[in-house]
Regions:
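Structural signature of tandem-repeat unit edges
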Residues: 1-3, 11-25, 35-46
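Acidic/glycine-enriched edge-of-secondary-structure segments
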Residues: 47-53, 99-104, 241-245
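A general structural motif
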Residues: 1, 37, 71, 124-127
């Protein structure tokens, strides 16, 4: 199967769809008015392209979360503010009754599906600590239910995560998948054997792991030369300063 045409399943009673990541074309128009469709299974038919990148850390983090499902835990979440900003070992030492997992990867993808995956693995007494990023407020505060291709980038190392989400709670799923597949088709293939901890943030091989078991990026990163906002945004953290288009 290479293409799923617009209207292919319009109005059908399909409940679950299984696709492969060598698909070339698909969009939401193929599944309009499919009110029973809840589950998307994706199987890997091609080599990964995001192995070694920060996207691929999400699957590792999720594996740790799964391993702690029955354990009282502290879950750290956001984008790179969590990935770079926490010392999970220090939190672990200060809160010995909680196991720590750092789920933060990338602020510029919708937090909603990530938080739904996390919520399903949390139990009474667990703690979720958010550190939302100012310039990605719309995505970080779940103001939309729309999927984006970056989420699929993060799911590439474990497509089974996608199948855990109820598609009726989201919009734009298949169009985002189509965008993701078109982009990766033109990228250099890698291998699942390549771990993000083998590389630094710029893709260079490192002698010591760049990520620890908690999910923290632990290589030294120098401070910025000044406090000028990277995206040119004011940093007074008032409601007037929040960008309307993020």
């Amino acid at each position: 199967l290479r293409r799923v045409q617009p209207g292919a399943f319009t109005g059908s009673a399909v409940e679950s769809v299984t696709l492969f990541d060598n698909l070339q074309q698909i969009s939401d128009y193929a599944f309009e008015n499919c009110t029973y469709l809840r589950t998307l299974h994706i199987n890997a038919a091609t080599a990964p392209v995001y192995s070694g990148s920060y996207y691929a850390t999400f699957a590792d983090r999720y594996d740790r979360l799964l391993s702690l499902e029955s354990t009282q835990k502290l879950v750290l979440f956001s984008g790179s503010s969590a990935r770079f900003g926490y010392d999970s070992a220090a939190l672990d030492a200060a809160l010995p009754s909680y196991a720590v997992v750092n789920m933060g990867v990338f602020a510029y993808t919708n937090a909603l599906p990530q938080l739904e995956l996390i919520r399903a693995r949390m139990r009474e007494g667990d703690i979720l600590l958010l550190s939302p990023e100012f310039d990605a407020a719309k995505r970080q505060f779940c103001t939309t239910n729309a999927f984006d291709d970056d989420f699929f980038c993060m799911a590439e190392a474990n497509y089974d995560m996608v199948a855990e989400l109820d598609l009726q709670q989201y919009s734009g799923v298949f169009s985002a998948l189509g965008s993701y597949l078109q982009t990766r088709a033109g990228m250099t293939q890698s291998s699942y054997a390549v771990s993000p901890s083998d590389l630094d943030e710029d893709g260079n091989a490192v002698d010591t792991p760049s990520y620890n078991a908690y999910g923290d990026y632990v290589l030294y990163r120098s401070d910025a030369a000044d406090d000028t906002p990277i995206y040119g945004l004011p940093v007074d953290y008032t409601t007037a300063a929040f960008p309307y288009d993020t």
